[in-house]
């Protein structure tokens, strides 16, 4: 297309052409066009291309750790991550995901950095693209039995072990997995640095969130679908009004003290007790002094 033909096109037509494969060919013509609106279309296209290039580079960099294994001929690298260590109710959920090498999934990132809508979209893409996916949840009883850290680690072992395609290596988000007999790379903030870990974080997050939402029918008034088990004001009020449920982790405060029957009498202690903050000796000393 020459300048004469291009100059006779309507702005709306040019805008539509910039959404086709002809965009790159039309860019020089648009930049030289006298119409400011057409020049803005060209500038917008360049900005969009730069953004897409930056995103592609980010996604490729998320295979830096996996790349060390790919270079050794190890291609089934499982990313493993957890969701739910912090809440005081509900399970800890772990996912293990093996993506095909260098599979670029636009928007893939740490699940905490994504909206719920975006996580749901990526969940479907990951489930479709992945070589293998496994997801394991350990409930409150298991967490109370083992402690949250060990329960998380054991869930990771199980998630890796139950993959339909055996993992040849593992990249984990800041977790040591010494019992594995295959190579393991533990990565701090791995859910934003590794594609497979990011994918695992999304699978785990969506799976756990869906489960917590499903509990609203069984435990109305607790708001599990809203706070997902974290100790928010809504959650606190629900527990005060309706009591502790089987979903609550009895080894976590404040339920640990409640289950033991420990209920501070002093107002000062009650304030900190309600905030789930453990008292130190200085507060005990204050109470003793006041009582004298």
Question: Where are the regions that the model predicts?
Answer:
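RNase H-like, Mg2+-dependent phosphodiesterase core
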Residues: 1-78, 85-268
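Short hydrophobic targeting helices and cationic amphipathic motifs
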Residues: 267, 271-275
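Short, intrinsically disordered C-terminal tails of secreted or membrane-associated proteins
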Residues: 290-291
């Amino acid at each position: 297309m020459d300048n004469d033909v291009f100059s006779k096109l309507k702005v709306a037509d040019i805008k539509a052409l910039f959404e086709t494969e002809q965009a790159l060919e039309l860019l020089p013509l648009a930049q030289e066009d006298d119409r400011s609106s057409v020049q803005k279309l060209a500038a917008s296209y360049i900005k969009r291309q730069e953004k897409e290039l930056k995103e592609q580079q980010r996604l490729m960099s998320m295979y830096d750790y996996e790349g060390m294994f790919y270079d050794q001929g190890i291609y089934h690298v499982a990313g493993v991550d957890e969701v739910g260590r912090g809440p005081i109710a509900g399970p800890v959920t772990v996912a293990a995901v093996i993506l095909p090498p260098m599979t670029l999934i636009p928007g893939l990132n740490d699940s905490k950095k994504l909206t719920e809508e975006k996580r749901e979209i990526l969940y479907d893409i990951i489930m479709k693209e992945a070589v293998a996916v496994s997801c394991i949840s350990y409930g409150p009883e298991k967490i109370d039995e083992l402690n949250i850290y060990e329960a998380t680690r054991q869930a990771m072992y199980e998630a890796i072990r139950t993959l339909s395609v055996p993992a040849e290596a593992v990249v984990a988000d800041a977790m040591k997995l010494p019992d594995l007999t295959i190579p393991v790379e533990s990565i701090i903030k791995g859910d934003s640095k590794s594609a497979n870990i990011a994918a695992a974080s999304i699978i785990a997050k969506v799976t756990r969130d869906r489960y917590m939402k499903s509990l609203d029918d069984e435990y109305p008034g607790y708001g599990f679908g809203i706070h997902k088990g974290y100790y928010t004001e809504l959650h606190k009020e629900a527990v005060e009004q309706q009591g502790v449920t089987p979903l609550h982790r009895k080894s976590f405060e404040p339920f640990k003290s409640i289950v033991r029957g420990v209920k501070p009498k002093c107002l000062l202690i009650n304030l900190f007790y309600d905030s789930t903050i453990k008292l130190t000796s200085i507060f005990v000393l204050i109470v003793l002094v006041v009582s004298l």
